[in-house]
Amino acid sequence: VAEVKAQVLMARQFPRDEQMAAEKILRECARPTLADAAVYTFPRGKETVTGPSIRLAEVLARNWGNCTFGYEVLERRQDNRGVGYSVIRAYAWDLETNMYISRQFELKHWRTTKNGGYKLTDDRDIYELEANMASRRIRACILQMVPGDVTQIAVAACRKTASSGLAEKMADKEQREKLISATVRIYE
């Protein structure tokens, strides 16, 4: 409780500068690695679903400032068939405005396959499933917390970076080596 009070107090003492936060977000969106991973796309039925990725949402929250996000496994149980499930809460909290957004969900410890599926019993498999599914809910919470226009501008900036050809140039081994040696010279 004391740690949370301290975080809220610090956030109110040092409020975010929205202009500076937006500039930091745009600087990060100029990075080819983020730009390439900024938007997810997957087929759902006859349509294609797209949106800001989990990685972009994390960048938005980190640079927006005065907020925290994550997930908690509230409990693990077994159903009447012996299949385990977790109750999980994903959240994003703007400490400055005290806006707390959460999503609570139940997650069956089950891996679906083309031939049906099987229950998960290995702790690592269960943890990875929880983390993966919680990340999607965290993204939704962050995108609800950060103003929509900031998100739209970030997505547009990432698309511009990705389409500028900069990503391809950075992938070129020779370009990477030049960048590394130039960076080394700066710090020598």
Which residues fall in each region the model found?
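Polyanion-binding surfaces on beta-sheet-dominated domains and ring/shell assemblies
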Residues: 1-87, 91-188
